[in-house]
UniProtKB/Swiss-Prot annotation:
Species this protein is from: Enterobacteria phage T3 (Bacteriophage T3)
Protein name, as recorded: Major capsid protein
Claim: Iron is one of the keywords in the record: no
Upper lineage: Viruses, Duplodnaviria, Heunggongvirae, Uroviricota, Caudoviricetes
Biological processes, Gene Ontology terms: viral translational frameshifting
Family the entry assigns: Belongs to the T7virus major capsid protein family.
Keywords from the named record: Capsid protein, Virion
Subcellular location, principal: virion
Length: 347
């Protein structure tokens, strides 16, 4: 049967000198009733590391005190001959500067718009600063693990950071989520012992890892889920604790902190996560499986806490929303930090 001739096609009949490729161009777009905002990003490090506030100044000092030993005193001996001085040093965290994120909303566009954007813009500004702080803390944790041998202890004898390499299974492959999960759990067993050997408290230990590796741990535990009810919730797909570590999945594990620009790859990025592993860089983006720590391993110093400011820009006929804070991040205790990494390709 031949195609019918004629018939209205409203979208293409747009008057003299007008044409449109879209035959539906003139039809009304009805508001769907929901604005598809970006999924919320949540800070994971803030409650899991040290936070200190200062009223003024450019940095905060954290004194470090070493250990001493006891010795028997025989009759006639002098304590002055046996005394061993307790060493002292310090860790200093500097304020990075004023970190900001802002948006400018023009009056005319606000008047034309049929849905609210201010609440979502405000949320996104706050999230961007929270993600920058998270990335900086995780990068500093990696930096502790990458300290050179000559400076990887605050005071000699207090303990060094731990780097553990996944062991390839005798059968199977680390590309199999179940085998990968088993390998990670095996290294967390060693990580637990390493921290305890450094006298790190058993409480407040955390293991940060990617969603892929988090899921691999779940896959390894699932066959025996009935025996591990205290460790995981199979229904929700969440892990509570493994080997004394709170397991936290972090999509932005290797993102690093903010820089001088707001691009995806910011210029002059502060607290950058190492990109490539080498003989001197033990933990980097290309080999990290996860980072483990005690909450005292890394610290954040706040000079100005997160705040929102609204300003009228009359010369632009617009409203400006600004999110800001002034903080600094730094490593404090190398002995309370560690990482699990992938084996080298040659291994």
């Amino acid at each position: 049967m031949a195609n019918i001739q004629g018939g209205q096609q409203i979208g293409t009949n747009q008057g003299k000198g007008q044409s449109a490729a879209d035959k539906l161009a003139l039809f009304l777009k009805v508001f769907g009733g929901e604005v598809l905002t970006a999924f919320a990003r949540t800070s994971v490090t803030m409650p899991r590391h040290m936070l200190r506030s200062i009223a003024s100044g450019k940095s905060a000092q954290f004194p470090v005190i070493g250990r001493t030993k006891a010795a028997y005193l025989k009759p006639g001996e002098n304590l002055d001959d046996k005394r061993k001085d307790i060493k002292h040093t310090e860790k200093v965290i500097h304020i990075d500067g004023l970190l900001t994120a802002d948006v400018l909303i023009y009056d005319i566009e606000d008047a034309m718009n049929h849905y609210d954007v201010r609440a979502e813009y405000t949320a996104q500004l706050g999230e961007s600063l929270a993600m920058a702080a998270d990335g900086a803390v995780l990068a500093e944790l990696a930096g502790l693990v990458n300290l050179p041998d000559g400076s990887n202890e605050n005071i000699e004898g207090l303990g060094k950071p731990t780097v553990l390499t996944l062991v390839k299974p005798t059968t199977g492959s680390l590309t199999d989520p179940v085998e990968l999960g088993k390998a990670i759990i095996a290294q967390l067993t060693i990580a637990r012992a390493s921290l305890t050997k450094n006298y790190v408290p058993a409480a407040d230990r955390t293991f940060y890892t990617t969603p892929d590796n988090y899921s691999a741990i779940l896959a390894a535990l699932m066959p025996n889920a009935a025996n591990y009810q205290a460790l995981l919730d199979p229904e929700r797909g969440t892990i509570r604790n493994v080997m004394g570590f709170e397991v936290v999945e972090v999509p932005h594990l290797t993102a690093g902190g903010a820089g001088d620009t707001r691009e995806d790859a910011p210029a002059d990025q502060k607290h950058a996560f190492p990109a490539t592993s080498s003989t001197t860089v033990k933990v980097a983006l290309d080999n990290v499986v996860g980072l483990f720590q005690h909450r005292s391993a890394v610290g954040t110093v706040k000079l100005k806490d997160l705040a929102l400011e609204r300003a009228r820009r009359a010369n632009y006929q617009a409203d400006q929303i600004i999110a800001k804070y002034a903080m600094g991040h730094g490593g404090l205790r190398p002995e309370a930090a560690g990482a699990i990494v992938l084996p080298k390709v040659s291994e």
